[in-house]
Amino acid sequence: MVSLRQLEYLVTVVDTGSFTRAAEQLHVTQPALSHQMRALEQGLGGPLLERLPRAVRLTPMGRAMLPHARAALADAERARCAARLASGTTAGELQVATVYSVSLGVLPPALRVWRRDRPDVDVRLIEFRHADELRDAMAAGEADVALGPVPPGWPGPVRTLGVEEFVVVLPADGASEDDATGVVDLATLADCAWVHYAPGNGLAELVDTTCAAAGFRPRAAVRTEQTAAAPILAAAGLGPALVPANVLPARFDGRVLRPSVPVRRTLAAYTRAAPDPLTAAFIETLVAHATV
């Protein structure tokens, strides 16, 4: 029978890259660690690790096992925290997975309220570049709740937070007729070099899709990983940028226009199963206070 201790040993060996370092981190002797790993492999019917002179490498069976081991350990830790919280014996931690742009623009007001009301519960943010990575991490049990674009076909509970609006940022010194209406046709910016997002960033895909719908492929003057950097670079004159409206600071020097065809995405909080009371309370705080 597989035990949580054995799964913890497996994950630690993989993460540290050696039995010696894993034994030190786990505060056990190396023979005891090796014995538990052999017992785990015997129980599963095959080798999980290939022992190399200076490292270890997962076998195909080990690669298949590892994500399930991580998910089981995460579930066990959440169960422990939930039980101890219910008994009032300890503070807890919420693991919140999200994408970079949401942690920047949507989350801060809700986190401020949560911290005020629940100072005993820490929040650990796990941030991803793309919504697909976020969905995969949540499916693997790496967080209590995920916040981001609604994943198609998600099998668990989904709670809609609202619709995120995108705006176009332009340099402050380039006023045009569009400023009077506050609206810009993206097709008029087809010849511009854009402030774009790095490949692999979920917003890069959104910009490409939006511009394609307007009849052109955006040419990048510069690419950035940071959502917060895009409007600053655009305001400095490097080119137009398409950004979530909620990431703009209160005082901002650039020109901000709405696309003539609105660009929006629905954001949601989603979990693998019915949320525990603590996670459910956090989701309610998001619904009430997130900036969407």
Functional labels for PLM-detected ranges:
Residues 7, 43-44, 65-87:
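Alpha-helical linker/hinge and terminal dimerization helices associated
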Residues 11-29:
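Short helix-boundary/capping micro-motifs
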Residues 41-60:
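A short LG(V/I)-centered, amphipathic sequence patch enriched
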Residues 91-153:
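Central regulatory/effector-binding core of bacterial HTH transcription factors
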Residues 128-192, 246-251:
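Acidic, Gly/Pro-rich loop/turn segments at junctions of secondary structure
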Residues 131-134, 139-142, 149, 200-255:
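Hydrophobic hinge/microswitch elements
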Residues 155-160, 164, 228-274:
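Beta-alpha-beta core module
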Residues 177-178, 182-185, 192-214, 276-283:
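Secondary-structure junction motif
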